[in-house]
Amino acid sequence: MEEYEAQLLVVEQALENAADEAQRQDLLALKNNLQELLALTRDTEDGAPTDELPQQGDDLDDELQRLRSELNDLEAAGSSQTALDEERQLADLRTKYTAMVGEKCSAPHEHSWGTCYHNALICGVDDEVVMSSEGVLDARLRVLFTNPTHREMLPCSYYLEGECRFDETKCRFSHGALVTGSSIRKYNPPDFHKLCRSRPVFALLPDRLWHRGRVLCVNFVEQVCRVRLDGQDHKERERDFKFEELYPLTTDQEEDDELSSEESNSSMNNESSDEAESDMDDLEEARRARMVELSLFTFKPTERLGAWEEFTRGIGSKLMEKMGYIHGTGLGSDGRGIVTPVSAQILPQGRSLDACMELREAANGDKDYFSVERKLKRAQRRQRKADEKAYVRESQRVDVFTFLNDSVLAPGESSQQGEQVAKKVKTNELQQHSTKTLNVETVRIADEIRRKQRDMAKVKQSLDRNSGDAQLQKRLQVQMQSHKQELATLQAQERSLSKEQQTRKSKNKMFEF
């Protein structure tokens, strides 16, 4: 009886934990059989004769053995069904995670002070199966952090190329961190529109690590931001970074930390009235800084800022920057003034305003019709064209020096040829030049003639001194012949100039009365 009651208790417990409907039906049938068997056993013990007891005992043993075998079969079927469910769940997880390979996510990383989430790239699925704290099966993913802040998070460049000689435990860099799939969060893309003064950011330095800092000023036109780094030397603390080298910290956790720190600071500062006044000043400065940042978002210049200082070395912008002006904001203490300079307008002299408006309407309402800059550019274009024409005219013009050098001083001509060329010089060519130019050229040619005569005298002395050397005599004869040809050419040129000067003097005498 006690064994039957124990078996009935086991069946009732199994019935409470059973989830499959077919298994529950089998357990209910077994429970009914046990209850009937217990009822029959009690009736038999009360009114059965003593000679039938051994036979009934054998029947009870057979029934108990059959009950045990059925329980074992049910337990084996339940365990096999559980194993199949776990394998199916694990296969679905692997299929899901394999499809996520190559996607960006936010993965946890264990630091000495706790766990922090960083953006990462899923690069593979690990073969090992893990069990969560709730008893749920899960797979592990291998991720590479895109914004590493510590050496152990920095991806190994040799591992990415497949050439790393160290395994994962011995390499100083990361071969990919293993994280559970359930701990993966959504990727947080950088939002550069939230860059503002005192915004915490991560900045990329040459060591390939992202260091923490705070924004000092932002230039949304050139997409450059100045950041004050935390924990750096004084000389290298403030640097300029491009937007792609920054990651704004805009998570809810950062905002909660900032709010909690502000609340604690405000509670401490409220202890004295002087500190309260300083807080009001800080709030006012923050409000003005926020207005400047809002103006940066809406500023869309049509031209490069400071283009009017192209020829002034930018002294105006430098002075304004010294006085606290931020590029891209408007003028004034609140940054609500104009951004681009006022263009100067020059109206036609002696015309009424109505006539000027009619001229502007005739030009299709052009606002820059009377602009000084446009007139200056038009004058510059006109002057440039005039300079080009003057250059072409001067390049085609032939003066007396060029004409004489090209026509008379041509190389390889004999003295007779020089005289013939000099005779063929046209009078109208020389008549194009002034008397002063002819006088200067005459003096120059006279000096050249005297120089050639001195050279010829030196060569003649050398000939007389070295009469016994045949080779030297030959070279000196060639030099003498060359000097004679050049002297003949210069003399012919001098005669042409003298003739022109004499002609002009004769004409002047003819015109005098």
UniProtKB/Swiss-Prot annotation:
Question: Which locations, inside or outside the cell, does it occupy?
Answer: Nucleus
Q: What is the documented function of this protein? A: Transcription repressor.
State the GO CC annotations: nucleus
What are the residue ranges of zinc fingers typed C3H1-type? 155-178
Q: Where is the composition biased (Polar residues)?
A: 478-495
Q: Where is this region: Disordered?
A: 252-282, 478-513
Does the entry feature the keyword Transcription, yes or no? yes
Enumerate composition-biased segments (Acidic residues). 252-261, 272-282
Q: Which organism is this entry from?
A: Drosophila erecta (Fruit fly)
Q: Which InterPro entries match?
A: G_patch_dom (IPR000467), Znf_CCCH (IPR000571)
Recorded protein name is: Zinc finger CCCH-type with G patch domain-containing protein
| Keyword Protease set for record | no
Here the segments flagged for biased composition (Basic and acidic residues) are 496-513
